[in-house]
Structure formats: structure tokens, C-alpha cells
């Protein structure tokens, strides 16, 4: 019982199939040595005590395997316990556990397999690296042109390939040799200088007729004017009204708010140019003025606009106040029997709807009918009417005449 437990290894102990110190030789001094006679009686208990993968470690010995085979024949197919050892003639490992000896068949077979593996490795030396003095096989020229292929297979990789490629006259087929100008185009602005002003940087490089480089300003000036751009900066431009050297071709004036050009391209003043544009004929010299007439524009300030409109409203309110209301004038001009003089008959003014004058809701439109007389009104009769002046009488008559 204790011996069977001693045979079971601990969980952290591994079984060595080819170890000579344990369970193989009785004279090895192993502390767990079991005679072969007791092994068959303990084999039924071994599968329950130790894991499955470690069972072949015990049956690896030839003596134990024979004893286990003899004892396992007692178990039939219907036995609930499986035999602990494999059938005779089969081994748990694909290779033999005996060391290869000089005269053993197993050792000879292993030596032959080892030699074959070494020969197979020698046939493919590329996995171990290529020596410096070696050359590539002939399969590479199939991927290259006829000019480059001989240089790759001519000799070892000692730099001769690079020299042969540099010595090719035309280079690779389908590609032309790079030109120096194209290399300079890859770096725009490098080493360029304007031949006119000497500028080294510009947004756009241009060329003149001879192919020299010009900066953008000089190139545009040369393109527009046909001459080289002057290197001296022009002075500040004078105002348009006092531009030096300009004179109107029509009226010979030198002062204007805007200089124009006629159909011939000659400079003219603003007045002559507008007159020619509107009328199609030159402006007469009699219309020339010493002072420039400016346009009277409306004031932009709102406060000034309100003030001017208020003052104009006050000025226009006075004549409106002097104009009498038709109702008032009609009531004033209405003849009363107390004021009428029998000796001096006056013009009789009849009013329709005079009874509606006192009504505030009555319409304000009144219809008057005049009966003209051949005699003039005496001043004494007109002076008796209170509240009427000379101006009021004239305006009242004008209002009645227009009605």
C-alpha cells in the first residue's frame, strides 16, 4: 500500500522516460525501488493514483512492460478497469529510449536520419546567409534588361555592379538622363536673380525676350510698356487737380476735379469731358468759368435736415395763416342788413347752405355765386366792415375767384 503511494509522483514532479536514476536499474541507488515481481499486483491501482500522461513512464522499461502484458491478459473486454500497459508490440513513444550505440539498429537508423537532415540543410545555404564572395544564381537576369543582367552575374558583390551601372551610356531603357535645368526647376528660386533690379525673391519669376530671369514687377512692366522698369522710385503722385504738365485741350485750364481723355486720347478737364460725352460736340469756350462749380448736395446730417425743415415749415406757415378759411371768408362776406347801405348798393353774394355754417359736422365745401356789378365799391362802405384789411380783402377775392 505504501509502496504504491510512493510510486505516485507529486504534482510538481515530472516523469522522465529516459532517466536512468529512477525505476530503471536496481543498482542506481534509487530510494523508491520496487522489485519487478510486485509490479503486476500494483498495476490495477496505478491508474487511480496517478495522472494518465504519466502511466507510460512506468511501462517504459522493457521488463516492466512484459510483466504488465502478462498480468493484463487476465482482464477481459468486459472488465471495468482498463489495462495499464499498451498491448505487446506497441510503444508509448515514437522513438526508442535506448541510446544509439555503435552496433545497435536503432542507433544506425538515428544516425542515418541525422546525416540526411544535415545534407538537406547543406543543399539550401541561403538560410544561413550568403558569403561576400558568392554570386547570385542565374534566375535573376530574367527580371532585368539585357544591359543590366550581365553586370549582376559577372562577379561577386564587391562594388563592380555599381561601377558598371554608372558606366552605362544611355541608362535604363525608357528613361532619359536628368537635365540640369530640370533639377533646378525642382527648387524654384534657388540661385535666381532679377537682371533688372537684382531682386532675389519674388512671388513669380518671369523671363524677358532673351530668356533672362525677371522678377514679377519688372516682368509686368516690361510686358506692358515694352521697356525696362526704372530702378529709381517715382516721387509721390500729385493731386489730380494740380497734376504737373496737364492742360485741358479744349479750354486750356489746369485745374479740375477729374482729368479725362477725349476720343483722341488727349487730356481734357472734367467739364469739357462730360460735355463732350453728353452732347457729342466740344464744349464752347464761352461756358468756361474761373471757379469750379460744385454740386449742391443735400446735407447728410439728420439734425441739420430737421432744423432746415422746421424753419421752412415756419416760413410756409405764415402765408397759410394769411389765407382765410372759406367758411370764415364766407361768413365774413355774408351781407348783413345792418351793414348794407340802401344808397350804395354792392355786389350781392348769395351762399347756398349758409344755414349749415354753424353746424360743425356739416361739409366744409361751399358753393358761391357772384353777380358782378359795373360800379366800384366805395371805400367808406368797405371801411365799415370790421376785421378786414387790404391784404385780407385781396386774398379773399383771389380765393373766391379760384373756387
From Swiss-Prot:
Major localization listed first in the record, in broad terms: nucleus
Highest taxon in the source lineage: Eukaryota
Ranges of compositional bias, category Basic residues: 294-303
SMART domains given in the database record: ZnF_GATA
Biased composition range(s): Low complexity: 72-82, 90-100
ZnF (GATA-type) ranges: 194-218, 248-272
GO CC, alphabetical: chromatin; nucleus
Annotated PROSITE patterns: GATA_ZN_FINGER_1, GATA_ZN_FINGER_2
Example GO molecular function: DNA-binding transcription factor activity, RNA polymerase II-specific
Compartments (UniProt record): Nucleus
Residue segments, region Disordered: 72-111, 291-360
InterPro entries xrefs: GATA_N, TF_GATA_4/5/6, Transcription_factor_GATA, Znf_GATA, Znf_NHR/GATA
Keyword Nucleus among record annotations: yes
Keywords recorded for this protein, A-Z: Activator, DNA-binding, Metal-binding, Nucleus, Repeat, Transcription, Transcription regulation, Zinc, Zinc-finger
Biological function: Transcription factor required during cardiovascular development. Plays an important role in the transcriptional program(s) that underlies smooth muscle cell diversity. Binds to the functionally important CEF-1 nuclear protein binding site in the cardiac-specific slow/cardiac troponin C transcriptional enhancer.
Protein name (database record): Transcription factor GATA-5
Native organism: Bos taurus (Bovine)
Phylogenetic lineage: Eukaryota, Metazoa, Chordata, Craniata, Vertebrata
